[in-house]
Design a protein with these regions (language model features):
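Structural motif
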Residues: 18-19, 43-46, 66-67, 201, ...
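Short gly/pro/ser/thr-enriched loop/turn and capping motifs at secondary-structure boundaries
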Residues: 52-55, 76, 230-232
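Short histidine-centered beta-strand/loop micro-motifs
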Residues: 56-58, 78-81, 204
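Metal-dependent amide/peptide-bond hydrolase catalytic core
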Residues: 87-260
Length: 260
């Protein structure tokens, strides 16, 4: 909004026709699902969802959510001998059977993907385990999902009275596959960064942004920095100086597209 206010206050600054959009549900993966791309009327867009100054990102994880449901047999513990099938224990065994020294967020970096159990709700009779599965390459992502499926089927299948449900929900695609046909969108962002005296930092996002979904829907949308740090933690913070730099880059970006 600082960039928009600056452009509004300085009509002499060159700019093309600009559109500004806000997506309130980005953190739950729904920020761009219902975004009116056609009504927005832009040829390209840029999200401001990065961290360090200079970040310019045109590649993300492909993300899916895997949900396991396990139904056991819940009976009174006083006469449970030979009858009780504890869904909570089965869920724990599935998690224990997954890799712990590899293929986790805390043991991977760079271009490595992972499987991340983030929620477990369990009782003796019913358990739900939710996991995020991430990778930059579709074939490797499918391998990770298959590993989870096979592990769950082996563990739960060892108890014939238990029942397993397995659901895979697509969350966002790697925007690289949709941006590679629009190199000008990225090169003009590089020009805007350098106009602010910042050298572009090209690193893939170990996560996703609304630009992933928007790019897949036909609106090429790379990501720029905002100066935020320690995202998704209780220590999340932002640098005011970096935020000001991000706003200045947006102004330079408008100028870069005005010269189209």
């Amino acid at each position: 909004m600082a960039a928009v206010a600056h452009l509004a206050a300085h009509p002499e600054l060159p700019r093309p026709t600009l559109r500004v959009g806000f997506t309130p549900d980005e953190e739950v993966g729904e920020g761009a699902t219902l975004f009116d791309v056609e009504g927005f009327g832009a040829v390209c867009a840029y999200t401001l969802d990065g961290s360090q100054p200079g970040e310019l990102q045109d590649e993300t994880f492909t993300g899916v959510q895997v949900t396991l449901t396990i139904d056991g047999v819940d009976v009174h513990t006083g006469w449970a001998t030979g009858k009780l099938v504890n869904a909570a224990r089965l869920a724990a065994r599935v998690l224990a059977a997954l890799p712990a020294d590899t293929l986790t967020p805390e043991t991977t970096s760079g271009r490595e993907g992972f499987v991340h159990p983030f929620e477990v709700r369990a009782s003796a009779g019913h358990a739900v385990v939710r996991m995020t599965v991430r990778d930059f390459e579709e074939d490797r992502l499918e391998q990770h999902v298959e590993l989870v499926r096979r592990t769950a089927e082996e563990v739960v299948g060892a108890e014939p009275r238990a029942r397993l449900g397995f659901e895979v929900q697509r969350q966002y695609p790697n925007m690289r596959d949709h941006l590679r046909d629009y190199p000008e969108v990225v090169s003009r962002a590089e020009r805007a960064l350098r106009a602010e005296g910042i050298e572009p930092v090209r690193i893939p996002i170990r996560g996703g942004t609304d630009g992933s979904v928007l790019s897949a829907r036909g609106l090429p949308t790379p990501n720029l920095f905002t100066g935020g740090h320690e995202y998704h933690s209780v220590r999340e913070w932002a640098s005011l100086q970096d935020m000001a730099s991000a706003a200045a880059v947006v102004v330079h970006l408008a100028e870069a597209w005005a010269a189209r």
